């Protein structure tokens, strides 16, 4: 009996010698909320009003030659209508309502412009043409006066346009807003914190979130940009909650990363779990843009194959190539407790 008892003692000592991990992420699952109709693909930007979600398509697959904004019921996720944006390209990105004017604006990457769109008919007009000749308008944010801030992924710039539109001015240009990385998009998602004392900018190719301090608010001169947090794999769209936590779509990690105002990660939500028999991603696949509403975070599954841009394959490229049905996912916006020491 000595050997069995000795084995038990040795096993107990070995187990006691291991230090438990500091934390393990209790990932809330991402479930399908809505499915894009036939003829539309690659949902990127997302916004919401009292009754509807509006989803802008970045259609690099050639499904259509015009830009599409797909409208879903806010409660059920049922498809209601598709707005065809005939005065723009098929490469639509960030979309948002100006909270001051009520205008629906969308970034048209292919047209190097921001469009104003009628949310009922899809009729559009140019709101802000992007200067410089190589514009990459990607995401939108607004200050309390209704001024519009536009991230430019290709010119390392945040532009500012007045509430009624017009040619924007370069508000901030900085190397931290550009990239030589993959995916080849620099400045991307935008979000002001609650007191408008800083503007946060996701840099997708650099895997960073950049903080632009605003010591006198948006009306004053912006401070020097600084890296707020790095190693967010493919930092894309941003949302910010009432506690000033940043919700970041990590498009190369297939997850939503939540960081608190100090930059400490407090949650990693969602994951990718393959392609279902209908050709739709299960969970998150190249998530692009989050929006927080009704106790959930809604996320567009862009499912973009980077090889279509002549780039080397990413780890999810072969999966994205299999997607034939494009989706919007939903995750509980409750921050789950950590499993482990805190």
Task: For the regions a language model picked out, list residue spans one by one.
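Short loop/turn segments that connect beta-strands within beta-propeller blades
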Residues: 73-77, 118-122, 162-166, 213-218, ...
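A short beta-strand motif characteristic of beta-propeller blades
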Residues: 29-37, 78-85, 123-130, 169-181, ...
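Beta-rich, blade/repeat-based domains predominating
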Residues: 39-52, 65-66, 86-103, 130-149, ...
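Short glycine/acidic-enriched loop and turn motifs that connect beta-strands
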Residues: 59-64, 111-112, 155-157, 206-208, ...
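A short loop-to-beta-strand structural motif that recurs across blades of beta-propeller domains
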Residues: 67-70, 113-115, 157-160, 208-210, ...
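Residue position within the beta-strands of beta-propeller blades
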Residues: 54-57, 106, 150-151, 201, ...
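Bacterial N-terminal signal peptides
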Residues: 8-17
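Blade-level signature of beta-propeller repeat domains, shared across WD40, Kelch, NHL, RCC1
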Residues: 289-342
């Amino acid at each position: 009996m000595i050997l069995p008892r000795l084995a038990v003692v040795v096993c107990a000592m070995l187990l006691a010698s291991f230090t438990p991990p500091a934390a393990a992420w209790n990932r809330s699952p991402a479930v399908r909320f809505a499915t894009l109709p036939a003829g539309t693909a690659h949902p990127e930007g997302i916004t919401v009003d009292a009754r509807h979600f509006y989803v802008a398509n970045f259609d690099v697959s050639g499904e259509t030659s015009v830009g599409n904004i797909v409208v879903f019921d806010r409660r059920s996720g049922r498809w209601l209508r598709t707005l065809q944006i005939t005065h723009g390209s098929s490469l639509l990105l960030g979309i948002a309502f100006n909270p001051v004017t009520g205008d629906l604006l969308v970034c048209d990457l292919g047209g190097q412009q921001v469009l104003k769109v009628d949310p009922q008919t899809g009729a559009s007009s140019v709101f802000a043409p992007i200067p410089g000749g190589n514009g990459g308008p990607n995401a939108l944010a607004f200050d309390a006066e209704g001024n519009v801030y536009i991230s430019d992924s290709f010119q390392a710039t945040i532009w500012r346009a007045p509430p009624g539109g017009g040619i924007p001015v370069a508000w901030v240009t900085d190397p931290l807003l550009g990239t030589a990385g993959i995916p080849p998009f620099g400045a991307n998602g935008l979000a002001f914190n609650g007191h408008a004392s800083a503007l946060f900018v996701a840099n997708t190719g650099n895997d960073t979130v950049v903080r632009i301090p605003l010591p006198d608010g948006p009306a004053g001169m912006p401070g020097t940009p600084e890296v707020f947090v790095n190693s967010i794999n493919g930092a894309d769209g941003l949302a910010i909650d009432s506690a000033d936590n940043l919700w970041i779509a990590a498009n190369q990690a297939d997850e939503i990363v939540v960081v608190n105002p100090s930059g400490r990660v407090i949650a990693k939500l969602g994951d990718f779990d393959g392609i279902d028999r209908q050709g739709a991603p299960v969970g998150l696949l190249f998530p692009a843009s989050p929006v927080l509403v009704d106790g959930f975070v809604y996320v567009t599954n862009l499912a973009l194959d980077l090889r279509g841009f002549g780039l080397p394959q990413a780890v999810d490229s072969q999966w994205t190539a299999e997607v034939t049905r494009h989706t919007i996912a939903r995750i509980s916006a409750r921050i789950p407790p950590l499993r482990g020491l805190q």
